[in-house]
């Protein structure tokens, strides 16, 4: 009643294993590949592991340092700096129940932070220190005060203007 498969239940699905002396390979720290087809003959041999310990890491002074930027990186940085050196047009749009400005369109340096836009708007609206002003770009999101005006204008401009909607109470979730 005892068959070879009943002694080892997993042997029914696996190929028969040959003893190491019959396979022609010696045991090593890596298991032998079980796939022996034409693909394995065309593949290159694996890179052997080094037998010595790990090398000491290089210090920062010994690492490679570029003496100058590549041309394309230098050109990209120059283009990015050129955008933030000009002026940007900002259009203020009041949301419901917000006071309306007489002049809604202003120019500001692209290198300024959005904080400058909010301070300028508070000054134009004659806000007290305790009054709140909520600003939204394109009536969609409230940018952080440390966001660059040039970057906001580049990404979210409409007709070459940065549309800033404002309200005295929170307008959006």
From Swiss-Prot:
Glycyl lysine isopeptide (Gly-Lys) (interchain with K-157 in atg5) cross-link site: 173
Keywords: Autophagy, Isopeptide bond, Membrane, Protein transport, Transport, Ubl conjugation pathway
Matching Gene3D superfamilies: Phosphatidylinositol 3-kinase Catalytic Subunit, Chain A, domain 1
Membrane topology: Peripheral membrane protein
UniProt feature, compositional bias: Low complexity: 1-15
InterPro entries: Atg12 (IPR007242), Ubiquitin-like_domsf (IPR029071)
Chief place where the protein resides: membrane
Keyword Repressor in record: no
Gene Ontology molecular-function annotations: Atg8-family ligase activity
Localization: Preautophagosomal structure membrane
Pfam families, per the entry: APG12
Gene Ontology CC terms, in alphabetical order: Atg12-Atg5-Atg16 complex; autophagosome membrane; phagophore assembly site membrane
Domain of life: Eukaryota
An example Gene Ontology biological process: autophagy of mitochondrion
Residue segments, region Disordered: 1-55
Family stated for the protein in its record: Belongs to the ATG12 family.
Subunit composition and interactions: Forms a conjugate with atg5.
Function text: Ubiquitin-like protein involved in cytoplasm to vacuole transport (Cvt), autophagy vesicles formation, mitophagy, and nucleophagy. Conjugation with atg5 through a ubiquitin-like conjugating system involving also atg7 as an E1-like activating enzyme and atg10 as an E2-like conjugating enzyme, is essential for its function. The atg12-atg5 conjugate functions as an E3-like enzyme which is required for lipidation of atg8 and atg8 association to the vesicle membranes.
Name recorded for this polypeptide: Ubiquitin-like protein ATG12
